[in-house]
């Protein structure tokens, strides 16, 4: 038996075994409790990265652990395989998106299998396949029938050269991210999902998601953005209509001194028509449209504005309020108009300072008087109303309702609720997405594709020039069709669906991936597996993907296809993987393999070690998982990803840490190999007979470790502390003098410890442990199906305990006592302790406070 651990000799062997034996293939079993573990599936970009490895390792450990606990575990994997990168590859390299995608899937599947992940590959789905998106198209038709899918004109970012709509994140400094052309705003007919039909249910559901990080729930609540307030009408000074504003701060209305309107708001064009300012206003609006919408609302972004040469009236004070177009108000939030109260809103304050506008204090702090002329920032705390007419002296929060009632009585306002969330625009002028199953007929209008004609499949022979709009819009065989209603000539919808649609229900399809009957989901199978018990993925998906998935599940529920409201019971958002950067003065950033002994391999210059940042290709601070597996094995990569940091924290990459994990695995291998001959024919110690000394301590340590690991891994996902406890146990075993072969009791205790180590490590380093388990004589059994060890509380209990002795709360001594020592005896020992006695001299003992199994505090005075 090779005493040296060589992962290459065992890892592929066990991967073949699991595949040949269908070890991780599962079916519904009503007699067993189910556990559905899911990591967010990847886009098939070509190669997995260390972020994938960490994410999937976390999930795999939980899946294997739950399996060993006796659960019927569903742990599937698939591919979020529609998307722009495949289409860009077709444009840039002349390779069809389907071929590019499937080649990438083949390679990445091989990489994932090489990591030893316990996926049920029989349930693999790829969202770009018609067998998947045909059901998505069916759901679309049902949504259209129920009014949940609809088409309307909408303002979009448009690239004139690419002839396509761009998402906000695809606009960089007003330019198309791909071709660099100037992006313009365009009004187009777009398809939408009516997510707002479920808006209150989605918001209320956040309160029941107790297994989700509060940070994610806060982000979802804020994105939904439910606000209670008033819609206030500000009459135009010239008598021509009103400007309507939604505000949650009607308590500050007496301090509203000017009006702000989003520069791109249609109202701006109405207000400036025929005025000298018209040309400047149009130019300003075009400039603002090019600015990033998220940046525009940032506190730190430059606040720009243009006076529109018109005024409205404050409905409570009658003041004339100058009206400005600005960049820090968005047209699609609220009414797109904001009443500015510069003394009580910091952005308004900065704007007023910049343009020399009037400031009036209407909320005063209780301890001082504010002078608007000397204020250096807005006062945004609570206080008492001043300069507010009949409401002077009221607490501002109590004045909210009173002023709302006053506005209603004047006919100038009404109570209302506003939401930030808008309906989900799903139209994409792209080829590589699921076709929208609708037909446009000049006689009948918009007509659904008959269900019997689904799926509407993407044609293969398309033009991927990247110019002239969607390839589908230029494909006559696809575009031209017959109207299902009148039989006349018609055209297909050439837009495809947003790829977030595919990822909004893939977890339900995993429950029945081969179900080929309408409606594509087998209710019995879905009801057995759903909801997902543990979902794992990055915080970057906290809003859109998770919100869309929650909406889509409710929609499928209302169609009778699923029986749950929420798709994911528990959510873990793992941290990023970070690594220090290295840079050469001449060659810029370097990959790790381009650095040898601190020097650039290209020019031998000494490299500059930079700060630790998230791994990225641009910084070249990435680690190739394939290299890691070749060099150290998959088990080492898995262990390091789990040991280096708790799963929710960022992981700082350390080559020394990887080496350390490899060494520990090697130590574990060697100690088992070294004991193999001695343990032949020896059963694990069963508790018969009394143990003493080191054997008793070893067995106690073993059961304490089992208890800690099961607590850390099963309840809290504290894999790093669980691994640390196992390492301590291995070290304890190494420190034990080797017993003679005839000491069968000692060997039985050692075998119990070794088997516990192997079983506890099994979810973490499955290849190593399967091999060691077999070497110990468990041929014909698979460790993945072996129950976890159970600790005996009496064995794990300490014989002795250390009690801290305090005098007036300060530690003065410690005493070791029997674990079952009586309280009065412990107090007596504390009073008689030599180190304590000098702190008691000349003082009166008031009382003794005993904290069981921890400390005695002697309270004295004098």
From Swiss-Prot:
Pfam families referenced in this protein's UniProt entry, alphabetically: Anticodon_1, tRNA-synt_1, tRNA-synt_1_2, tRNA-synt_1g
GO cellular component: cytosol
Localisation: Cytoplasm
Presence of keyword Ligase: yes
Catalytic activity reported: tRNA(Leu) + L-leucine + ATP = L-leucyl-tRNA(Leu) + AMP + diphosphate
SUPFAM superfamilies noted in UniProt: Anticodon-binding domain of a subclass of class I aminoacyl-tRNA synthetases, Nucleotidylyl transferase, ValRS/IleRS/LeuRS editing domain
Domain of life the protein comes from: Bacteria
Motif ('KMSKS' region): 614-618
GO biological process, one term: leucyl-tRNA aminoacylation
Renumbered ranges of motif 'HIGH' region: 42-52
Residues reported to bind ATP: 617
Record-level Gene Ontology MF annotations: aminoacyl-tRNA deacylase activity; ATP binding; leucine-tRNA ligase activity
Enzyme Commission number(s): 6.1.1.4
Keywords of the record: Aminoacyl-tRNA synthetase, ATP-binding, Cytoplasm, Ligase, Nucleotide-binding, Protein biosynthesis
Ligase listed as a keyword: yes
Similarity annotation: Belongs to the class-I aminoacyl-tRNA synthetase family.
Protein name in the entry: Leucine--tRNA ligase
Lineage of origin: Bacteria, Pseudomonadati, Thermodesulfobacteriota, Syntrophia, Syntrophales
Primary gene name: leuS
């Amino acid at each position: 038996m090779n005493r040296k651990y060589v992962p290459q000799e065992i890892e592929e062997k066990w991967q073949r075994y699991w595949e040949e034996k269908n070890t991780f293939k599962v079916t519904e079993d009503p007699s067993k409790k189910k556990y559905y573990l899911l990591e967010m599936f990847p886009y098939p970009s070509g190669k997995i990265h260390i972020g994938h490895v960490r994410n999937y390792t976390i999930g795999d450990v939980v899946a294997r652990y739950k399996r060993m606990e006796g659960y019927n575990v569903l742990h599937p994997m698939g591919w979020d395989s529609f998307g722009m990168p495949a289409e860009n590859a077709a444009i840039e390299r002349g390779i069809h998106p389907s071929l590019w995608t499937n080649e990438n899937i083949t390679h990445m599947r091989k990489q994932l299998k090489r990591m030893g992940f316990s996926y049920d590959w029989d349930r693999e789905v790829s969202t770009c396949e018609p067998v998947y998106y045909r059901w998505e198209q069916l759901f679309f038709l049902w949504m259209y029938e129920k009014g949940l899918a609809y088409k309307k004109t909408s303002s979009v970012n448009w690239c004139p050269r690419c002839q396509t709509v761009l998402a906000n994140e695809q606009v960089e400094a007003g330019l198309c991210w791909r071709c660099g052309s100037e992006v313009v705003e365009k009004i187009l007919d777009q398809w939408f999902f009516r997510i707002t039909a479920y808006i209150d249910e989605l918001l209320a559901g956040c309160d029941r998601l107790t297994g989700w990080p509060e940070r994610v729930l806060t982000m979802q609540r804020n994105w939904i953005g439910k606000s209670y307030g008033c819609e206030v009408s500000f009459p135009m000074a010239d008598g021509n209509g009103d400007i309507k504003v939604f505000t949650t701060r009607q308590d500050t209305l007496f301090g509203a001194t000017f009006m702000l309107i989003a520069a791109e708001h249609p109202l701006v064009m109405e207000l400036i028509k025929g005025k000298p300012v018209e040309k400047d206003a149009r130019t300003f609006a075009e400039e603002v449209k090019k600015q990033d919408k998220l940046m525009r609302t940032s506190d730190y972004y430059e606040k720009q504005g243009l006076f529109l040469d018109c005024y409205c009236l404050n409905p409570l004070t009658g003041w004339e309020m100058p009206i400005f177009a600005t960049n820090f108000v968005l047209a699609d939030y609220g009414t797109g108009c904001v009443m500015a109260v510069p003394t009580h809103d910091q952005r308004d304050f900065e704007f007023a300072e910049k343009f020399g506008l009037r400031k009036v204090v209407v909320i005063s702090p209780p301890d001082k008087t504010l002078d608007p002329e000397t204020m250096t920032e807005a006062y945004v705390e609570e206080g008492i109303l001043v300069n507010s007419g009949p409401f002077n002296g009221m607490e501002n929060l109590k004045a909210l309702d009173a002023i709302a009632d006053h506005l209603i009585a004047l006919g100038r306002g009404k109570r209302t609720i506003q939401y930030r969330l808008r309906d989900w625009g799903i139209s994409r002028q792209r080829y590589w997405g699921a076709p929208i199953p609708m037909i446009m007929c000049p006689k009948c209008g918009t007509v659904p594709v008959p269900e019997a004609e689904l799926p509407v499949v993407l044609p293969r022979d398309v033009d991927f020039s990247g110019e002239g709009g969607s390839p589908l819009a230029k494909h006559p065989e696809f575009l031209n069709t017959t109207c299902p209603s009148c039989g006349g000539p018609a055209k297909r919808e050439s837009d495809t669906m947003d790829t977030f649609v595919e990822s909004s229900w893939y977890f339900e399809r995993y429950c029945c991936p081969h179900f080929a009957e309408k409606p594509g989901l087998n209710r019995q199978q879905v009801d057995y597996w759903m909801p997902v018990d543990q979902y794992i993925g990055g915080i970057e998906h906290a809003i859109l993907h998770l919100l869309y998935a929650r909406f889509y599940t409710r929609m499928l529920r209302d169609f009778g296809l699923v029986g749950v409201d929420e798709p994911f019971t528990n959510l873990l958002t793992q941290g990023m993987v970070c690594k220090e950067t290295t840079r050469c003065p001449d060659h810029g950033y370097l990959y790790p393999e381009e650095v040898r002994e601190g020097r650039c391999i290209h020019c031998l210059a000494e490299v500059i070690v930079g700060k630790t940042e998230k791994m990225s290709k641009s910084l070249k601070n990435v680690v190739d998982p394939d290299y890691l597996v070749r060099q150290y094995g998959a088990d080492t990569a898995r262990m390091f990803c789990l040991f280096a940091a708790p799963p929710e924290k960022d992981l700082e990459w350390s080559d020394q840490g990887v080496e350390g994990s490899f060494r520990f695995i090697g130590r574990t291998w060697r100690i088992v190999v070294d004991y193999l001959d001695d343990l032949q024919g020896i059963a694990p110690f069963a508790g018969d007979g009394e143990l003493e000394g080191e054997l008793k301590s070893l067995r106690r340590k073993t059961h304490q470790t089992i208890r800690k690991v099961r607590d850390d891994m099963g309840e809290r996902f504290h894999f790093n502390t669980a691994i640390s406890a196992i390492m301590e146990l291995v070290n304890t075993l190494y420190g034990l003098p080797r017993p003679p072969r005839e000491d069968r009791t000692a060997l039985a205790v050692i075998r119990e410890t070794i088997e516990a180590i192997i079983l506890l490590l099994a979810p973490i380093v499955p290849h190593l442990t399967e091999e060691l388990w077999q070497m110990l004589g468990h041929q014909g059994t698979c460790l993945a199906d072996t129950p976890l060890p159970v600790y005996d509380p009496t064995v794990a209990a300490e014989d002795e305990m250390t009690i801290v002795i305090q005098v007036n709360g300060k530690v003065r001594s410690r005493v070791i006592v029997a674990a079952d020592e009586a309280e009065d005896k412990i107090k007596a020992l504390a009073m008689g302790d030599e180190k304590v006695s000098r702190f008691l001299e000349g003082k009166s003992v008031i009382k003794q406070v005993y904290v069981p199994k921890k400390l005695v505090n002697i309270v004295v005075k004098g």
